[in-house]
Amino acid sequence: YIQLREAGLLEAYQSPELTDVPEAYQDEQGVWNPIYIGTLCFACNTDWFARTGTPMPTCWDDLLSPALAGQIVMATPKSSGTSYTTLATLVQMRGEDKAWEYLKKLDQNVGAYYTASSTELVKQVSTGDYAVAIVFYHDGRRAVLDGYPIEVRSPADGTGYEIGACALVRNAPAGERENACTFLDWMTSARG
């Protein structure tokens, strides 16, 4: 949204439904409207951890355990917003040099490849192909609600987040602006 705003492709519109949303999660320029916050977490296959007796990770450094060699799945930050958020989080928490050192160590525990997108990660952990996926909390929680042997764990030493948003496109057909505003109001409401 920031790039679209800077390119002048979005029109300022702030839904009246945002009165209960803290300003820290809103766009200072009033262009995009927040609709959710997604925090990074570890989606862990409880069957795998019970079978191996390996402790479930509680912090980022736990992912470096030799017991998790080849058992972590994540997407590449080149194409995945989830993994880009992971990279940015680690840089903010540890500083750039220490973050890259950490990622080199983590790479030793990542399975055969990095996926292009994070959409498949929870499925791979749900079916037992891997023990841990680094994903957004809502993706892991969905697997829990669907009955998979998943436990969602937030890193105790801190984590990153994304703000999902929606915005009004500039120069949309004049007759559709009112409908678009109504939709944005619904998306930012408790019902949306």
Residue ranges and their predicted role:
Residues Y1-S126:
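Extracytoplasmic ligand-binding site segments that recognize negatively charged/polar headgroups
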Residues P34, C41-A43, Q71-A75, A131-V135, ...:
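Structural recognition of the beta-strand scaffold that forms the well-ordered cores
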Residues G38, Y102-D107, Y114, D146-R170:
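Periplasmic-binding protein-like
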